[in-house]
Amino acid sequence: MSRIGKKPIDIPSGVEVKIDGNVITVKGPKGSLTKEIHPEMIVKIENNQILVQRPSDERHHKALHGLTRTLIANMVAGVTKGYEKVLEIVGIGYRAQKQGKKLILNVGYSHPVEIEEPAGITIEVPDQNRIVVKGIDKQQVGNFAANIRKVREPDPYLGKGIKYADEVLRLKEGKAGKGGKK
């Protein structure tokens, strides 16, 4: 058995799970998520828990087993708690602001970069140097945060740019090197 796949997923109170063939719908206090899973995976609801089983011990079935269980667990966590990614903007004159459903980034280009807020995602800008991306779909939140970061990735020498709040940057040394001038 897959170490991850064999663990049952507890269904918290207030969450409704519906299985229709290979389509799983999870409804909770924060919203509803629907995902199509691999047709070979067997998903059952027993004793207020979701169980994921695989048809055989073949290598790809083992991989799909853990993946399917994790995707369903992420859906349950998303509709109960939600997900958020925090980005920080580092650099003189670099800032973010929100206008309606648009995020406007001034990050050293000759023009401000405008990014539209997609459906299912909310953007908060608590101050000019922080962006908080929130949503119920873990993959969508992560992808959107990565797209914002891609606008101006952190510079490897100075660290200027957009980075995740928990990201640790290893800065390179300049041309002078360790010894400096001789």
UniProtKB/Swiss-Prot annotation:
Molecular function GO terms recorded: rRNA binding; structural constituent of ribosome
Annotated keywords: Ribonucleoprotein, Ribosomal protein, RNA-binding, rRNA-binding
GO CC terms in record: cytosolic large ribosomal subunit
Keyword Ribosomal protein tagged: yes
Alphabetized Gene3D superfamilies for the sequence: Ribosomal protein L6, alpha-beta domain
InterPro entries: Ribosomal_uL6-like, Ribosomal_uL6-like_a/b-dom_sf, Ribosomal_uL6_a/b-dom, Ribosomal_uL6_bac-type
SUPFAM superfamilies: Ribosomal protein L6
Organism domain of life: Bacteria
Gene Ontology biological-process entries: cytoplasmic translation
Known role: This protein binds to the 23S rRNA, and is important in its secondary structure. It is located near the subunit interface in the base of the L7/L12 stalk, and near the tRNA binding site of the peptidyltransferase center.
Family statement drawn from the similarity comment of this UniProt entry: Belongs to the universal ribosomal protein uL6 family.
Subunit structure as annotated in this protein's UniProt entry: Part of the 50S ribosomal subunit.
Name this protein carries in UniProt: Large ribosomal subunit protein uL6
